[in-house]
Swiss-Prot record:
Highest taxon above the source species: Viruses
Organism, as annotated: Invertebrate iridescent virus 6
Skewed-composition ranges (Polar residues): 33-57
Ranges for region Disordered: 31-57
Name this polypeptide is given: Uncharacterized protein 156R
């Protein structure tokens, strides 16, 4: 669990730094994917599902 938490935290930190770039990508995805079937708010779902494919370094 500890490793996972640290991993996620670092992912979020990386994500924050590249927000201007990734948000353009994410908004393209969000319009036709998340809103239709995801019960969560779009921001939350994007951070969980789309965060990883786009920010793996």
């Amino acid at each position: 669990m500890n490793f996972l938490q640290n991993f996620c935290r670092s992912k979020f930190i990386v994500f924050e730094r590249v927000t201007p770039f990734t948000h353009k990508i994410i908004h393209k995805h969000s319009h036709h994917q998340t809103s239709s079937f995801n019960p969560m708010p779009s921001e939350v779902s994007l951070h969980t599902s789309h965060n990883f494919p786009h920010t793996t370094f």
